[in-house]
Amino acid sequence: MIKLILASKSKVRKEILDKNNIISEVEPSNVDEDIIKKSLIKEKASPKAISKNLAELKANKVSKKKNENLVLGADSVIDLNGELISKPKDRKEALEILKKLNGKKHNLISSVCISINGAMVWNYTDTAILTMKDISEEGLKEYLSKISDEALYAYNVYQIEGDGRNLFLHIEGDEDTIMRLPIKKIKEYLNNYK
């Protein structure tokens, strides 16, 4: 059976791999995402390109150390009318992000990349479109009070498979993309890998 190395410390992504019977070990890339995002934004890269570049960079970095192993890098970004929304650093920032998204449509872009020996061999990027309900500030605070710090940072503000679903009026796109790991596409690649 193929073993996959996850270039991330995301417990959520690891759990998804485990639930899908994909043998994996964790080796965080420790890539400084903020510096890379700022550089790519300066170069006028699209949110989709930023997500794809980060996933590839993470996979390539770890795969250079883990020769002959398949390494999975992943990244997700929120695009609000061209503005890149990053993970919150604390609950105050999480509230500000939710207020920004409140009553609006945004794109959630998820990218995955598999690399071997420091070179990408496969990648996939998908976009889901989410329309958030118009919720009072008190309602947003109540939502934030219900989720753990770990969930808050792991899911980039909203935990769609939990109470986060109630924040949205309309969700268009693949559930795997929204969960930030397009697992069906990863399994397709692994099943065809020789």
Predicted regions and their residues:
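Anionic-ligand binding region
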Residues: 111-123, 127
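Generic enzyme active-site microenvironment
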Residues: 73
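Active-site-adjacent loop/tail segments of enzyme domains
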Residues: 76-106, 132
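Active-site oxyanion/phosphate-handling segment shared across diverse enzymes
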Residues: 123-194
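Amphipathic, non-transmembrane alpha-helical scaffold segments
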Residues: 51-52, 98, 176-179
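N-terminal polybasic phosphate/anion-binding patch
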Residues: 1-70, 84, 138, 142-145, ...
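Short beta-strand-to-turn element immediately C-terminal to the catalytic PLP-Schiff-base lysine
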Residues: 79, 113-115, 169-170
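Structural motif
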Residues: 3, 69-70, 106-107, 111, ...
